[in-house]
A protein has these predicted regions:
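Juxtamembrane cytosolic/matrix-side boundary and N-terminal portion
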Residues: 541, 659-670
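Short, surface-exposed tryptophan/glycine-enriched loops
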Residues: 193, 384-402, 409-411, 516-581, ...
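Charged, amphipathic alpha-helical segments
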Residues: 475-486, 563-568
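Alpha-helical coiled-coil scaffolding segments
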Residues: 200, 581-582
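Classical eukaryotic N-terminal signal peptides for Sec-dependent ER targeting/secretion
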Residues: 1-9, 393, 667-680, 689-691
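Beta-sandwich/jellyroll recognition modules and their flexible linkers
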Residues: 14, 167, 217-219, 236, ...
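Compact interaction modules built on cysteine/histidine frameworks
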Residues: 543, 547, 552-556, 636, ...
Length: 691
């Protein structure tokens, strides 16, 4: 739900020009509303429903536990923005647990997600079509995760039977009629799964929940957690542990790999090089030309000094001839989800020459007999050096068993460094559509100017950019439609598109992230004081600006969040790391959700490769051992299944494979079928004539 605040500001879009641009914020001044505030305004005393004629559900009872994937229906009364947030929340569950969700087919038990009066759910699986309400103001990541945790069988954290050892409930400060929200759950009806009390749980009330105005209702016995309880970013790591233990998860639905090279572990990766001096990827603590330390142990705003010494992988380009390469390849992974889309996230540091190149490939294997595989170039990094570790995302679309290859290639110039990588994560969810990294954060925070991202394009051609402005105690975060090269071909206004802005938690392991994100969706009802739709073609109702390339463009209103995050949140966890703050963003088409409960599989945007490699593929660094013989052909053909539609990156150069000398893939490198039959006959005769 959006509340529009109209402002007009003079924005510096270049060192020479300022233009008056309309600013239309979708947030109210202050923090987003919490569940208790939303429900109190709706005259609801709790966000937990009690089923009539059914004993209160217990997370100790397996009868109330769902089978995964959990069937659901996004009902028509849901706001379109809420639908998009719910699907994003499902991806977080998939990333961190074995819980999956799917649109209902004919299952008896399912969750009916509706827009009712407030935010609420039953605890556990109760009956067919049980309602879960994401009402007005409830469409945030944390609230959606909170309500679905109820549906999965979890009570509030402060309702634990052992809560009195950790918090004190001040009943005299609770508004009359709301005392039941602070009842404890009986030990026989619940379990804590052997985990400690979690002040950081997304299921914990805040300190002022249901206050009558006389002070806090919850006081932590350890004062340092008083401002922690009630966080509304994401599931905490302990929330995830408890969920996985309760559902006996052995693995996650959508996570494949994490490697920070800590304890000098290569995580099953292999290296090889094609150079005369045997230089290649090495595990180091620091590298000539930089960086001086790994990314994992960089100091954060919440821990000013890095206390550990870590490792990262470095490939030097300081010696060797132009075109020499060194490769780092991951272990083999198997796509498991119906949508064949993966996201590779890593941090890199470039201290070499601007002509040096880091190529990112995937190598797919047809079956267990394929030891060579076929590789495709999915991304490329080149250009000027970096002064900080920088985040990078590469969208993948592997349909078979695959591995990722990082290939460092020496350029034509003089290098004194090379490429370094650290903190690799690979998952089966869609990558963010872009990122904006603010290095030298402390300096930027004291500078009140606006920082813009480069111009971005959606998969179907709409142009936009992101704008961040620091205000000392908080920062503003907005997006802005721009004129682009496809404007005449597009449908205007640009409607039912969800903009998600995320302040990234830079914790090394993606599964431990508690990023802060907020989403809004473009609507036909978003109009300014002149009655013009905010999302119309900027060439019609926009203002002339100068973009990052000093090119003239037209820009629509800036729209987003005046107070995206306050300083106390920014300084917590790992939001600022190595003096860098990272914003990721996605601009998602939600039009299919008007009638459906799921989105189609994501399409990959075309990838621009500046320097297509010309050399032949020499195969993987380590060839796996394949079976000696193939199984006999099947007499019946299995039904052919087609993978979901994806758009492959636009090919810029074809990689030529060397011709195979034989179709037999025996580990011995030759086939008996290639031996001439007269020779076999002679050998057989000699054997028979021997005494």
């Amino acid at each position: 739900m959006k509340v529009f605040i109209f402002l007009v500001l003079g924005l510096a879009v270049s060192s020479a020009d300022t233009d008056e641009l309309e600013i239309i914020d979708v947030d109210e001044v202050g923090q987003p509303k919490d569940i208790t505030e939303i429900n109190r305004a709706s005259n609801l005393s709790d966000d937990i429903l009690e089923a009539p004629n059914i004993q209160r559900s217990s997370i100790n009872d397996d009868d109330y536990i769902w089978e995964s994937p959990v069937p659901y229906v996004l009902e028509n009364d849901l706001e379109i923005n809420a639908k998009g947030v719910i699907l994003r929340a499902f991806d977080e569950y998939r990333l961190k647990s074995c819980i999956d969700f799917r649109p209902r087919n004919e299952e008896y038990y399912y969750i009916s997600v509706r827009k009712l009066n407030g935010c609420f759910s039953y605890v556990g699986r109760i009956f067919s079509g049980q309602p879960l309400s994401i009402g007005r103001f409830c469409d945030s990541m944390a609230i959606v995760q909170h309500e679905f945790l109820h549906a999965l069988g979890f009570f509030h954290e402060q309702s634990r039977y052992d809560r009195d050892d950790h918090v004190k409930i001040l009943f005299e400060n609770i508004e009359k009629g709301f005392e039941n929200n602070f009842e404890k759950v009986n030990k026989t009806d619940s379990t804590v799964s052997g985990l400690p009390y979690d002040y950081n749980s997304v299921m914990h009330y805040g300190s002022e929940a249901f206050s009558n105005g006389n002070g806090s209702t919850i006081v932590t016995k350890d004062p340092k957690f008083q401002d922690v309880i009630g966080q509304r970013q994401q599931l905490s790591p302990i929330d995830v542990k408890e969920l996985n233990r309760r559902y006996k998860c052995k693995s996650t639905t959508a996570f494949h790999m994490f490697c920070s090279f800590s304890n000098e572990s290569m995580c099953g990766m292999n290296t090889c090089s094609h150079s005369d001096n045997d230089s290649g990827w090495e595990m180091v603590k620091q590298a000539q030309g930089g960086p001086e330390t790994d990314h994992s142990t960089l100091p954060t705003a919440s821990s000013k000094n890095g206390t550990e010494e870590g490792y990262f992988m470095h490939a030097s380009t300081a010696s060797g001839e132009e075109g020499e390469t060194s490769r780092l390849e991951t272990k083999m992974m198997e796509p498991t989800r119906e949508c064949h889309v993966q996201c590779l996230q890593f941090y890199y540091y470039h201290s070499g020459d601007e002509s040096d190149i880091l190529n990112i490939w995937i190598r797919e294997f047809d079956d267990q007999f394929d030891s060579e595989g076929t590789r495709r170039l999915m991304g490329q990094i080149t250009g000027p050096q970096t002064s900080h570790w920088r985040i990078h995302h590469v969208s993948l679309n592997a349909t078979k068993n695959f591995q990722v290859e990082f290939e460092a290639r020496t350029g034509a110039g003089n290098s004194s460094g090379g490429f370094s990588i650290d903190d690799i994560n690979l998952s089966e969810i869609e990558c963010p559509h872009g990122s904006l990294q603010i290095d030298n954060y402390m300096e930027s925070n004291n500078n009140k100017s606006i920082i813009y991202s480069p111009r971005q394009y959606t998969i179907d051609g709409y142009a936009y950019r992101i704008a961040i402005q620091f205000k000392g105690a908080y920062f503003s975060l907005r997006m802005q439609m721009l004129s682009g090269e496809n404007d005449e071909k597009l449908q205007w206004p640009c409607l039912q598109r969800q903009m998600t802005l995320r302040m990234l938690d830079q914790t090394t392991n993606l599964q431990l992230h508690m990023s802060a994100e907020r989403s809004f969706t473009t609507s036909p009802y978003d109009v300014n004081n002149l009655g013009l739709n905010l999302w119309d073609n900027p060439r019609r109702n926009g203002t002339e600006v100068v973009d990052e390339n000093n090119q003239t463009a037209f820009a629509g209103p800036l729209s987003g969040y005046r107070t995206f995050a306050f300083d106390d949140l920014i300084q917590s966890r790992n939001y600022v790391k190595g003096d860098s703050l990272i914003i990721t963003f996605s601009f998602q088409d939600l039009n299919p959700l008007i009638k459906e409960s799921a989105l189609p599989c994501p399409e990959l945007a075309p990838v621009m490769i500046a320097h297509p490699p010309l050399d032949l593929d020499s195969g993987p660094c380590v060839r796996r051992i394949t079976p000696v013989t193939r199984p006999p052909p099947s007499t019946t053909k299995p039904p052919r299944t087609m993978p979901p539609k994806t758009t492959h990156p636009t090919p810029t150069h074809s990689t030529t494979m060397p011709p195979k000398t034989t179709d037999d893939k025996s580990i011995f490198g030759f086939s008996p079928a290639m031996v001439a039959s007269p020779v076999l006959t002679l050998l057989l005769a000699l054997m028979l004539s021997m005494p």
